[in-house]
Amino acid sequence: MTRLPAIFLLSGILISACHFGDAPRTPANRKPAKAKEGRIPDTVKVGIYITSIHDIDFKEKQYSTNFWVWFKYKRKEFDFINNLEIPNAKTFSKSFTTSDTTNGRVYVLMKIQATMKDSWRIGNFPFDQQRMMMSFENSQYDINDLVFAIDSSGQQYDPRFTLNGWTIDSSRVMVTTRPYESSFGLDSLPSNHMDYSSFRVRLILTREAGGLFWKMFLGMYIAFLIAYVCFYIHADGFDSRFGLSVGALFAVIGNKYIVDSSLPESTSYTLVDALHGLTLFFIFAIISATAISLKLVKMGRTKLADRFDFITAQVFLLIYLVVNIYLIYQATQNN
């Protein structure tokens, strides 16, 4: 019996030792996780080969293009077949895709048909030069995970394809950072700002304007010449002179509407506006000169009226030609 208290005492000591050795962990004694070190983004080599550009539509501000694009990288989760984004494309589709994952790297090749949107520079139309831009991004990974590098081997476009009415002056590929001032609803982001690596291709095209210029402005110049001929109608034919001049005025206005219908809307003052405005001004000046001649005839000063018509005709024609040449020259030099 005397051993029982000793046994109970020993058991209590063992139980207490076990209880304190397995004490529950509280937030006070939990070790904090180590801070994440700065990530080094993976590099994706990208290249492009444009095979055609067609269906350039100035009114709808778009054009169509076919091209091959390829990506070479290590991380399979980048998945450019599903994550490729072309921000300035209205629509695009892949007519061919292939991928290779040998040697621990991923190679993706795609043939894409796209309808691209663009803002045309029409200030110097039809002596204009256009800069067509295409950009490519990964829709899932920002610049902290992925940066593009240019695969500069070979050319960026097929020199054999011809673009009707245009000449390709140059091409350039570049890598930039595109900022988005939004968190896209992700509360975990520290700010409403994200940066994505962007691969961009720029083609500079110059319009072959000779034939197009005369096609669009020949009616305007003929209308001016019809009004100009009024100076050589005898002073007695004022009805004919006024009729021809007013008819020419409306012909120029009609030609302006026809030309504008093929161009996108613009708030800037263009070469088309300048040439039509100049022609309208000179036709109005011809009508005003005709009115002065009529007044001189009614005053009985017919010879003076004839002399006034002759001098005014030469001055108007010279100024009109000089200003036209100047405006056209400026348009060809300002691209």
Predicted ranges, named:
Residues 119-120, 166, 217, 232, ...:
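Generic detector of bulky aromatic hydrophobic side chains
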Residues 17-77, 261-264, 268-335:
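Intrinsically disordered, low-complexity peripheral segments of secretory-pathway and membrane proteins
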Residues 21-204:
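Soluble non-transmembrane domains of integral membrane proteins
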